[in-house]
């Protein structure tokens, strides 16, 4: 269910702002989005998995907070990120 190390490395490489950047909001949101998408596929097959659903809701809330922070600090980077990830708003 979790992302493999190679998938994480590819996402970090695609969204990092500089070499070795793993903590920028863009990278964090991209990783959360990938995890959320994987969990959504999991729930199509496992509708009764309420324990994991709680984790999904937590990830969605964390992503929302990071997106709100990025929108406050740098609206241009925010708009570029949601366009690249295909998120609404």
UniProtKB/Swiss-Prot annotation:
Instruction: Choose any GO biological process term that the UniProt entry carries and state it.
Output: translation
Note whether rRNA-binding occurs among the keywords. Answer: yes
Q: Which Gene3D superfamilies match?
A: 6.10.250.3130, S15/NS1, RNA-binding
What Gene Ontology terms describe what this protein does at the molecular function level? rRNA binding; structural constituent of ribosome
Q: Does the record's keyword annotation contain RNA-binding?
A: yes
**Taxonomic superkingdom:** Bacteria
Mention any one GO cellular component term assigned to this protein in its UniProt record: cytosolic small ribosomal subunit
Q: Which UniProt keywords apply?
A: Ribonucleoprotein, Ribosomal protein, RNA-binding, rRNA-binding
**Short name of one Pfam family for this protein?**
Ribosomal_S15
Coiled-coil residue windows: none
PANTHER family for this protein: RIBOSOMAL PROTEIN S15, BACTERIAL AND ORGANELLAR, SMALL RIBOSOMAL SUBUNIT PROTEIN US15M
Q: Could you say which protein family the record assigns here?
A: Belongs to the universal ribosomal protein uS15 family.
What does it do? One of the primary rRNA binding proteins, it binds directly to 16S rRNA where it helps nucleate assembly of the platform of the 30S subunit by binding and bridging several RNA helices of the 16S rRNA. Forms an intersubunit bridge (bridge B4) with the 23S rRNA of the 50S subunit in the ribosome.
Q: How does it assemble?
A: Part of the 30S ribosomal subunit. Forms a bridge to the 50S subunit in the 70S ribosome, contacting the 23S rRNA.
Q: What is this protein called?
A: Small ribosomal subunit protein uS15
* Lineage summary: Bacteria, Pseudomonadati, Pseudomonadota, Gammaproteobacteria, Pseudomonadales
